[in-house]
Each structure stands twice: as C-alpha cells, then as structure tokens.
Amino acid sequence: MSDPVKTTMVASEHPCDKAFSATSIKNYIAAFFAQFGTQGMAYTLFSSYLSVVFTDYLGVNPAAIGMVLSVGVFTDIIMGNVMDRVHTKWGKARHWFFWSALPVAICVGLMFMCPVSASDTVKVIWALVLYNVYCTCLTSVRLPAFSLPSVCSDNSRTRMLLVWVASEGTNVAATVTGWIIGPIVAIYKGNPLSGWRLLGWIMAGATLLLLVLAGALLTEKRNGADLERIEAERKAMKHTEKAMGLGEQYSYLLRNKYWLLFQGGGLCNGMSLGFLIGSMGYWIQHVLGPSGLAGDNPIGLIMTVMNVPMMVAPFLILPFIKFVDAKNIVVMFMGLGAVFSLGMWACGLKIWWLFVVLMILRQCVGSCVNGSANVLLTRAIDYGEWKFGVRQEGVGSSFSSALNKVSMGVATAVLGFVLANSGYSGGGTVGESTQAALNFLFMGLPGIAMAVGTVFYGLSLGSKKWNQIRAELDERNAVQQ
C-alpha cells in the first residue's frame, strides 16, 4: 500500500529535492566523502605513481607495467548492469559503500607489497592480479558514487550542488595526496620503497573510513517501495516477467541521442584527464624535477597548483548556477580549457611564471567542466526514462567510468612504450626526445581532446527542453502513485 503522505507530495516538496534540507546536506557530505575515497587518495596515487613505483623501485619493464595497467575496463560496464539489478531497501547505491569498503582497502594496502626479490614475471602477475581486483572492487563503489546526483534528487539545483561537492572531494583528496607523498616516502631515506608501502596502508585505512561514512550518511530519493513500483512499471510496460537482458538495456542507451552525445564529450574529457594524470608522475620526475623550478617538493607544488584552483573555482560561479544552464557552463569552460592547455604546451617551462598562470587557469575551467558535466548525464538518463520508460542510472553511468579507464589505460600504455623505446629502465634520466613526448602527453594531447569534446557537449540537452521532460515525468509519477 502506498504512503498517503508520499502520494500527495510533488517532486519539489521531497526532502531530497530541497537544496538545503537536512537530508540533502547529509547527501552533500556523503558525496564529498564518496569522491574523496574513490576518486581522490588511492586513485590519485595509483593513477600517477603506480607505474613509477613498479618501474623505478621494483624494476619492472615500463612497457610491461603499461600493458598491465591498461587492462580493467570491462568491470565498469558489468558493474553498471549489476547496479541496476541489485536493489536493497536503501535503494540502488547506498549498500555498495558498505559492501565494497573493506575489499577496496585491502587491495590498496597490498598493491606495493610485492617482494623485491621476486622474478619479473611474478612482479608483473602481482600487479596484473591486484590491480584488476582493485579496479573491480573500486568500480563496485565508484559507479554508485558517480550516480549520486541522479539517485539522490530530481531537482536541477540539488543535483548541481551534489556534483560540485563531489568534485571538491576529489580535488581536496588529490591535493592532500600530493603533499603527503614526499614526506611519507622520505621517512625511509635509505629505502624509499618502504615509504611507498607505508603510504599505501595509510591510504587503505583512510579509504575504508571514508566509504563507510559515505554510506552511513546517504539517503536515496527512490528506495524501498519506490523501487518496487518502478520495477513493476517496467515489467508492465514490457508485458513480461523476464528480466531485461544486457542487449536490451544497451539498445535503449544506443537510441538515446543525448546519452551518446554525453559519452562523446566524456570520452574527450576522459582522454584529456587520462593523459594529464597518467603522464604527471613521469613528467614531474623527468621534466619538471631536473629543471629545479619547483623546489624540493615538485609533487606537492604541482598538485597544489593543479588542485587548489579546482577547489576555489566552483565557489566563484556557484551563485550563478541557478541562472546559467549547466550545458553553457560546460561548453564555455571546456573550450577555454583547450586554449589554456595548448598554451602551456607552446610555452613550456621556458617562461615559468606564464606556465604556472596558464596551468592555474586551465585547472579552474577544468573544475567547472568536471563539476557540471555529470548534470548532462542525469538529463540524458531522465530523457531515456521519458522516451523509453526505462530509468538506467547504473548502466547509464557505467560507460562514463569505463571511458575514463580506457583513456587512463591508453595513456599508461603509451607512456610505457615511450619510456621503454627511449632506453629508460627505471630511476635514470631521459633524453630530450622523451621529454618532448612527455610534454605533448601532459599538455598537448589534453588540449586537443578538450577542443573536440567542446563540440559534443555543445549538442547536449539544454535546460529548457529538460525542464519540460522533467515536468512530464513528475506528472506521470504523481498519477501512477
């Protein structure tokens, strides 16, 4: 039996749709912790330095470790399907934070524990197995974290705030990670590998705590009886009790033009971030570090220059999100990001102050893109529900995460082959040609990718049409309840 209070409640009166209700505030904190734990600390460490540790301190061939880290894409797609099928009384996402916290933490702690005396084959197998188990476990909580704007609220402003807060969690975590890497590794001056291992276990404990806290604070809008009703409606629409197959699910997505456009823009943005983050560790160590421009802690300095602007920028435009369409924000700042990134590549380190200014500007606009783009995904999911009667938060979000992994894997594999072909065997210096390649991977390719992504995002669903779609969906739900 439906709740008489709930049946008379319009979407805008639901606690999850009120931007500053107690429920929404707890959801913002949960989104912050979720991204801090999934996209921030350990993820930042592994994205930029896992290959460095295995090549420089464990002696693994760069090309081999590059291929190992390029695997692990399909777990995202599979988990998206699982997320849409596995519901609990809490909803679609919340339970995953409790189920996955410990496995993720264990994988993080064990990642750098491979014995130095082991053969190269054993080291590669260690990295292959642990990294892919880590990716699988992380995906099981990372996708629910990505889906929070969609599962927590139907209000555009609340969704935007959820996305912004989550983005802040990523940036704060990445900055903290950048500053603690050097000091913790330096604890073991004669044996830096022990420092990396200690760092891994610190990250493991922090990840476990953050994910459990995120799950404890989270409240989804559609849970319990709501999910049962939605599932019943889908079955009635199909006139069958047979569960929707994977092919059927993707057939809906492939007919959703706005989902396809979002994935095109997401692929470009993912490639930009993939090459930027994937090459950052080597770029700092072999291009910036030898120049002496960044002082004694180049990791901390660059992470600060990259992430502090990303933390500050959202607050500067936050007052305007009620009046400016998220699509316009994404398109404008994506285009500016391309200009600034290509400007960095052209400038190089020859004019250090200009390089830093351009990096700050690029990170500011990049934060605005990352903090707004997921709103376009939630609109695409709403469009799919409006057009086909099927709401696909999990599988609809999974491709975005998979594309991020594709780009990161490609970047890591390319880096590995570039270093291997230059004769680099770990811990040594590189030639000018390798430095030029690292500059292109760190600055040139990200700029090109952002320029192409601007076109895809420019064709995405705007607020005017989305508001009409959302109103019709709310009317349908009110009648069906």
Question: For the regions a protein language model found, what residue spans apply to each?
Answer:
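Central cavity-lining transmembrane alpha-helices of secondary-active solute carriers
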Residues: I65-V86, I106, T175, T304-L316
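Glycine-rich segments within core transmembrane alpha-helices of 12-TM secondary carriers
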Residues: G72, V104, L161-V185, M303-N307, ...
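C-terminal ends and interior cores of transmembrane alpha-helices
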Residues: H95-T121, G335-K350
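C-terminal transmembrane helical hairpin of 12-TM major facilitator-type secondary transporters
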Residues: V330-A373
